[in-house]
Each structure stands twice: as structure tokens, then as C-alpha cells.
A protein has these predicted regions:
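Bacterial Sec-dependent N-terminal signal peptides
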Residues: 1-25
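Conserved redox-active cysteine motifs that mediate thiol-disulfide chemistry
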Residues: 67-80, 258-275
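Thiol-based oxidoreductase modules, predominantly thioredoxin-like and allied folds used
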Residues: 92-117, 132-142, 284-298, 310-321
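Short, internal strand/loop/helix patches
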Residues: 115-159, 167, 302-337
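Thiol-/selenol-based redox modules, centered on thioredoxin-like
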Residues: 161-234, 337-376
Length: 376
């Protein structure tokens, strides 16, 4: 083996070892033990204020709950946390919720039970939508607070006494489905602390969504690469085909967008439809696009769809009379592009929009529909 080959072999293995070390080199969170002091923090709330442990210095009991916008289990407990906060506020109990997931580590494929991600801006929307009566704090992507407390899943509740010593760590209650539990485990722990007693049990296991630690972003990148590699196609569709599409003989909620490459608003908003499709495609949902470009412009339409990585069902209207398309889609449609429909099986129109959509509104409609839902 010559010297040059030896040199490059050594370099190759050196970089390989570095890469392996970087993959394995991440903090291993350990759950805070009973009796330990609450780690301090300095976090921004959805109300714009900065909170630290000292912000709750007068609390007779401090409840810290690690939660997440996107998590079905966490969402199932939101109303219970609001009710629990209202019940104990007058007793000197402070309740705080912290969102600690790393947003780059959350794939769109994990957002099938929500209208929102876990970013700070999305937290503000959830805080307002649900009228949270407790501070909702953002741990940011460095996750320092979560690493200090070591939550197992979301939601994970911690109860500290007046001296900020941990007395309880675990679940809120044993019944995830809304309406089947009232936060019994957490309430019992708070009652015990207020009475100067030790909660029994002091710890429980925690069922919920795994924490999205920053080192998990590799999985998100793998999913993005998988989507990018999926084939994109566009097929001709006639007036009759459009009628059948709108009638929706499937067992899925169907979102249809009518667009064209020459329509500025259409091409500007198309990425939002891809996001929506990737969020809900594992649920009883499908996204379909229909191009109104001339049939001879089919390749141009396909080129655009490939740029968008639109691996959903795509069609181009192949009949000559565009007005028949308009009537086939929706007699109420006046003809301006873009046009969007959300259809139940059987063709009932849940939502229609002439002009650009509001993506958040569409997501709320989808996840709020009885066929989809926010909970398992």
C-alpha cells in the first residue's frame, strides 16, 4: 500500500470516527428526583414576559407541566390543566406549562393531530385559542430547561412545595380521553403538598408523546429526503372525471385546489397545500390538485409540481370548455383562480374559497372535523 493510499485511508477513518462521535455525543436527560430543588430557568412566555423560578417564589405549591402544541395526548389534557389552575389559584398554587421540543426535530408527518407546530409563534396562537390561565413558556431549541428537569414525555407534571423541592413527578391522571379524567393524580399530589404531606405515589410513569430532543432532527431530515425522492405526476381529467372527484366516493376528507402556472396567487400559495398534505396524509385525508393550464402546457405544469415535490394526486383539465369545469366543481364558483374545496365523502362541501386560502383556517377545519380529530 503506497503512502498516499495510507494517508487517505487514515483521513477517511478519522472523519468517520468524528461523525460517529458527533452522532452519539448528545446530552442524556435524567428525570429530576424527588426531593431535589427546582432548577432555575429564564424563559419567555406567550404573553411576552420573561419568567424565572423567582417569579413563583410566593407559591405554596408550584406545578410545572412540560407540554407540546402538536401532541395529541398533551392537547387532550389542556382543558383539564385550565380547570385545575382555576381550582387551585386561590389556594396559592402556581401552574406553569413549558414547551421544550426542538422545532427542527419535528417532522410535518408528526403534525397529523394538530393545526399548529411547537414554535413560539404557534404557542401564542394556542395560548389565545384555549384561553390558558397560566404562563405558557418557550424553552427554545437549546432545551436547557427540559434537559435540567428531564421530562419523559408530554405532558409530564412536576409538583414542588413552597421551598421548591420536588414532591411529585408523573402523569396528570390515568385517563387520556377528554371527559374521562379530572386530573386526579395531579390534584392528589397538590392536595398532599398543601397539607404538608408527601404525595403517595410520589412518582408515576408518563404516557404521551416522546420529547423531540434536538439530536432527533436527523429523522426529520430523512423524512424530507424521502418526500423529495417520491415520484410526481400529472394526469388528464375530463369534465366527468371532475364530477366524480367532487362527488368523493372515497372514505377520506378531500381537499381540492384548482390552480394554474400563470396564476400568481396560485403558485405562491401552493407550498401551503404541500405542507397540509404532509401533515394529514396519514389520516383519513387526501389532497388533490387540478391545473387549468391548457393541455399543451402539461409539461410546464408538471415541472412546477416537481419543484413543489407534489407527490399527491395531480390532474390537468383536458376538455376544451373551461366553463364546464367551473360548473362541475361548484356552481357557486364564479371562475376566479385559485379555488379550493374541502369535501366530505359523498361530496358535501365543508369549505370553499375563491382566492387564496388562510392555511391555519384550513388546518383548523381539517383537524376539527369528526373524521380527523386531535386525539387518539
Amino acid at each position: 500500500m503506497n503512502i498516499k493510499r495510507i494517508f487517505f485511508t487514515v483521513i477517511f477513518f478519522s472523519f468517520s470516527l468524528i461523525a460517529m462521535a458527533q452522532k452519539a455525543d448528545h446530552p442524556m436527560p435524567v428525570t429530576l428526583a424527588i426531593g431535589q430543588s427546582a432548577p432555575d430557568f429564564k424563559l419567555k412566555g406567550t404573553d411576552g414576559k420573561i419568567y424565572s423560578l423567582n417569579s413563583f417564589s410566593k407559591a405554596k405549591a408550584l406545578v410545572i407541566i412540560f407540554s407540546a402544541n402538536h401532541c395529541p395526548t398533551a392537547q387532550a389534557y389542556e382543558d383539564r390543566i385550565v380547570a385545575l389552575t382555576g381550582k387551585y389559584k386561590a389556594m396559592g398554587v402556581a401552574v406553569v406549562s413549558i414547551s421544550s421540543n426542538s422545532t427542527p426535530a419535528i417532522s410535518l408527518s408528526e403534525l397529523g393531530y394538530t393545526d399548529l407546530g411547537d414554535s413560539y409563534q404557534d404557542m401564542i396562537i394556542r395560548y389565545r385559542d384555549k384561553k390558558f390561565n397560566f404562563p405558557y413558556l418557550y424553552d427554545s431549541d437549546d432545551q436547557k430547561t427540559a434537559l435540567a428537569y428531564g421530562p419523559v414525555a408530554t405532558p409530564h407534571a412536576y409538583v414542588f412545595d413552597a421551598a421548591k423541592k420536588l414532591q411529585y413527578s408523573g402523569r396528570i391522571d390515568a385517563s387520556e380521553k377528554p371527559g374521562t379524567g379530572n386530573g386526579e393524580d395531579l390534584s392528589n399530589a397538590i392536595d398532599a403538598v398543601l397539607s404538608g404531606k408527601s404525595p403517595n405515589p410520589a412518582t408515576t410513569k408518563v404516557f404521551g408523546c416522546s420529547m423531540k430532543w434536538s439530536w432527533k432532527k436527523e429523522l426529520t431530515e430523512q423524512q424530507l429526503n424521502k418526500w423529495a425522492a417520491m415520484p410526481v405526476s400529472i394526469n388528464n381529467i375530463t369534465e366527468q372525471g371532475v364530477k366524480e372527484l367532487v362527488h368523493n366516493n372515497s372514505k377520506k376528507l378531500r381537499l381540492i385546489n384548482i390552480w394554474a402556472t400563470w396564476c400568481g396567487p396560485c403558485t405562491m400559495e401552493f407550498a401551503d397545500f404541500i405542507t397540509i398534505d404532509r401533515m394529514y396524509q396519514k389520516r383519513d385525508f387526501e389532497f388533490v390538485s387540478i391545473s387549468t393550464d391548457k393541455p399543451e402546457k402539461k409539461e410546464k405544469a408538471l415541472e412546477f409540481l416537481k419543484e413543489q415535490q407534489a407527490a399527491n394526486k395531480n390532474f390537468i383539465y383536458s376538455d376544451s370548455d373551461i366553463y364546464k369545469l367551473i360548473e362541475a366543481v361548484d356552481p357557486k364558483w364564479q371562475g376566479a383562480l385559485p379555488y379550493t374545496l374541502l369535501l366530505e365523502p359523498g361530496g358535501k362541501i365543508v369549505y370553499s374559497q375563491q382566492g387564496p386560502i388562510n392555511p391555519l383556517r384550513i388546518k383548523k377545519m381539517i383537524v376539527g372535523h369528526q373524521m380527523i380529530g386531535r386525539y387518539y
